[in-house]
């Protein structure tokens, strides 16, 4: 399997910077691993969205797009579960 490039969109980067320190290291580790496995165990495809997925990190969610043609994972949102789908 070939490796995917991972990009973090500007809005998601700002959300990442605002994460509590206890969550930040775990989030970065999970995001980096998406380059090797963009659909890890436990990820879910979001209903009503084309190619949009989410992974769970405790009470936090990382929402991302997968472009299999370009081999690209784009992180679009990182937020607490109560806020992420607004």
Kindly give the residue locations of the regions a language model identified.
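Basic, Lys/Arg-enriched alpha-helical interface segments
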Residues: 1-57, 68-74, 83-86
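Residues forming the ATP-binding cleft of Hanks-type serine/threonine protein kinase domains
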Residues: 79
């Amino acid at each position: 399997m070939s490796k995917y490039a991972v990009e973090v969109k500007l809005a998601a980067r700002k959300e990442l910077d605002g994460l509590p320190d206890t969550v930040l290291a775990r989030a970065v580790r999970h995001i980096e691993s998406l380059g090797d496995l963009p659909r890890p165990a436990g990820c879910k495809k979001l209903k009503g969205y084309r190619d949009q997925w989410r992974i769970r990190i405790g009470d936090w969610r990382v929402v991302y797009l997968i472009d299999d043609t370009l081999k690209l994972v784009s992180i679009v949102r990182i937020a607490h579960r109560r806020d992420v789908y607004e």
